[in-house]
Design a protein with these regions (language model features):
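Membrane-embedded alpha-helices of multi-pass transport/permease systems
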Residues: 28-33, 92-95, 99-121, 151-159, ...
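Glycine-rich helix-loop "coupling/hinge" segments at transmembrane-helix boundaries
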Residues: 68-69, 160-190, 195-196, 221-222
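Transmembrane alpha-helices
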Residues: 132-164
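Transmembrane alpha-helix signature in integral membrane proteins
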Residues: 8-36, 151
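Cytoplasmic-entry segments and transmembrane alpha-helices of multi-pass inner-membrane transporters
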Residues: 33-68, 97, 107-114, 121
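Loop-to-helix entry region at the N-terminal start of transmembrane alpha-helices
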Residues: 7-18, 68-104, 188, 192-196
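Short helix-to-coil transition segments within interhelical loops
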Residues: 113-143
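C-terminal transmembrane helix and the adjacent membrane-cytosol boundary/short C-terminal tail
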Residues: 80-81, 85, 95, 111-114, ...
Length: 226
């Protein structure tokens, strides 16, 4: 660690930064997309088919697939490189992991909305609520623990997935694992592996506790649960 202290700090920051960017974007896109898939059955089948197909592709293969269109675009439009969009590095890693995160969050949203008791929706309509108000004031509070559970699965999977980015030049903690394997240096491998494991267990623990706290608060307030 002493030898690679500065490099470790940079790689650690890159690793966490990529994971959070992927999951935040996944939530911003996935929550409304999951709601749309639930409200429109035909579109929901198309969305589900696309996301299930992407989910079935191995991580490294999907990252490599992303490299081709991104390389073409960055060569065709050179200004994209000035904004960090290229066929190697962070962009293909982000795009691939974003697709996986989207799968988890959309599925969580869709599955949770399906089991919301219709009597609460009907009661909200009877009070004159709009579709948006029903979603934000009725459905979201009911399914919030399920959404957070989906985010938990997505975040832990993304932290692991960022590791693979080292194979195409992204400098996360996977860089130490790859470097250690190439040099048969177990200490360097562990320098990358242990922090990744620690992050996975930490995020999993924190988000599980958050779900428990929300459930306790809901019981105190008398809010229904899925």
């Amino acid at each position: 660690y002493t030898t690679y202290q500065k490099q470790f700090a940079e790689c650690f920051g890159n690793h966490i930064g990529m994971a959070f960017k992927v999951v935040v974007c996944g939530v911003v896109v996935g929550v409304p997309l999951g709601w749309y898939a639930y409200k429109h059955a035909r579109a929901g089948k198309v969305i589900s088919t696309i996301l299930n197909t992407i989910e079935s592709i191995p991580s490294l293969a999907l990252i490599c697939v992303m490299m081709f269109p991104l390389s073409f675009l960055s060569n065709r439009f050179p200004f994209l490189k000035d904004h960090g969009i290229a066929g190697v590095g962070a962009t293909p890693v982000f795009c691939a992991l974003f697709c996986y995160a989207l799968f988890q969050i959309v599925n969580s949203m869709y599955g949770a909305l399906k089991v919301v008791d219709k009597q609460y929706i009907d009661a909200a309509r009877g009070m004159g609520m709009t579709v948006r108000q029903i979603f934000t004031k009725v459905e979201i509070p009911i399914i919030l623990p399920v959404i957070i559970s989906g985010i938990r699965v997505s975040l832990t999977a993304t932290v692991l997935g960022v590791t693979i980015g080292s194979y195409i030049g992204y400098g996360g903690l996977g860089k130490f694992i790859l470097q250690g394997l190439n040099g048969f240096a177990i200490d360097i491998v562990m320098l990358g592996t242990l922090p990744i494991m620690g992050l996975v267990f930490l995020f999993d623990f924190v988000l599980k506790k958050l779900v428990v706290l929300i459930e306790i608060h809901r019981k105190a307030k008398g809010v229904v649960k899925v």
